């Protein structure tokens, strides 16, 4: 094997042909050599012909992966519920539906809160994107998309725009105005273009950049104003279904999950995957950062939710019961991080004690599978969307 570095070339005698030429440092079996460009290319080609076949490289990758898992296992000396034994148990938990938002003509697929803690944007299989007043249940804006299955929507941090997309393979941004009679579609701005459906989108900490996830197996960071691709993220082996941006104070990272059963943490500046977790047994439908940014939760079609500690670099808790046989479609934390709300395909919302791993409540009300769920910015309520065409605000 050989690895080439990007150090500045120097002039001297080549260790291969011994001619005085511009040299580049090359590592061969961990030994540093100085080769001219011609010899370096010949050596790389010979190495590939001799033993660096695709099969051998895959074998080496699997070997390294096994060693990594062994090192992780050495650090696995305690479980979260054991540490939490001395933590006081939660008291009586009471939440119920306070508002029901009706207006979509088909399955609600996604929703997001505005930072003003009052307005909600939702998208549906009927091709509509609606902005709601969650206090009065009034519809403030409505947009008809050119395609059905609007699978992603997001509110801009300023509250002055929304983003949405789905089977049209692109992310569109609509500015919001006080004039409710204004034609919003005329001001539409197409920002992101993928080669397959758009599954999720999220503004960064400003209105100027947006993250997208797609069925083409990639995530991407875009400039909203110019529509320029700023960074692409490749690493998933199948459709990417969800993403979540880390809390602003923890740095430029985000987590994604997909049909390859992987949850991957990405550095937005370099475009590189910095951590990956593969403990789920089926598609990962939802990921959400813990409020501190030190961990994240995931919900999967394997009927479990899981908690991953980024500092320990491993899974630390599984939230499941034998009676739960349907997949988890959406997850989110309470503002304190003590509770994990999870929507399931059996029409229920389960509330989990994050520390103790126990279920503290089951919320009933939806008449079809729960497809999306988000806690309000102030933590006083959460909203769920369902295939029963409605959204419910719980408190």
From Swiss-Prot:
It is found in: Membrane. Keywords: Disease variant, Intellectual disability, Membrane, Repeat, Transducer, WD repeat. Its main location: membrane. PROSITE patterns: WD_REPEATS_1, WD_REPEATS_2, WD_REPEATS_REGION. Pfam families: WD40_Gbeta. One of its GO terms (cellular component) is dendrite. Widely expressed. GO terms for molecular function: G-protein gamma-subunit binding; GTPase activator activity; GTPase activity; protein-folding chaperone binding; signaling receptor complex adaptor activity. WD repeats lie at residues 103-142, 145-184, 193-234, 236-278, 279-318, 320-362, 365-394. One of its GO terms (biological process) is signal transduction. Disulfide bonds: none annotated. Belongs to the WD repeat G protein beta family. PANTHER family: GUANINE NUCLEOTIDE-BINDING PROTEIN BETA G PROTEIN BETA. Enhances GTPase-activating protein (GAP) activity of regulator of G protein signaling (RGS) proteins, such as RGS7 and RGS9, hence involved in the termination of the signaling initiated by the G protein coupled receptors (GPCRs) by accelerating the GTP hydrolysis on the G-alpha subunits, thereby promoting their inactivation. Increases RGS7 GTPase-activating protein (GAP) activity, thereby regulating mood and cognition. Increases RGS9 GTPase-activating protein (GAP) activity, hence contributes to the deactivation of G protein signaling initiated by D(2) dopamine receptors. It is linked to Lodder-Merla syndrome, type 1, with impaired intellectual development and cardiac arrhythmia: An autosomal recessive multisystem disorder characterized by delayed psychomotor development, severe intellectual disability with poor or absent speech, and bradycardia and/or cardiac sinus arrhythmias. Additional features include visual abnormalities, seizures, hypotonia, and gastric reflux. Lodder-Merla syndrome, type 2, with developmental delay and with or without cardiac arrhythmia: An autosomal recessive neurodevelopmental disorder characterized by speech impairment and variable expressivity of attention deficit-hyperactivity disorder. Some patients manifest developmental and motor delay, hypotonia, and sinus-node dysfunction. Component of a complex composed of RGS9 (isoform RGS9-1), GNB5 and RGS9BP; within this complex, the presence of GNB5 stabilizes both itself and RGS9 and increases RGS9 GTPase-activating protein (GAP) activity. Interacts with RGS7, forming the RGS7-GNB5 complex; within this complex, the presence of GNB5 increases RGS7 GTPase-activating protein (GAP) activity. Interacts with GPR158; promotes the GTPase activator activity of the RGS7-GNB5 complex in absence of glycine, in contrast GTPase activator activity of the RGS7-GNB5 complex is inhibited in presence of glycine. Interacts with RGS6. This is Guanine nucleotide-binding protein subunit beta-5. The lineage of its organism: Eukaryota, Metazoa, Chordata, Craniata, Vertebrata.
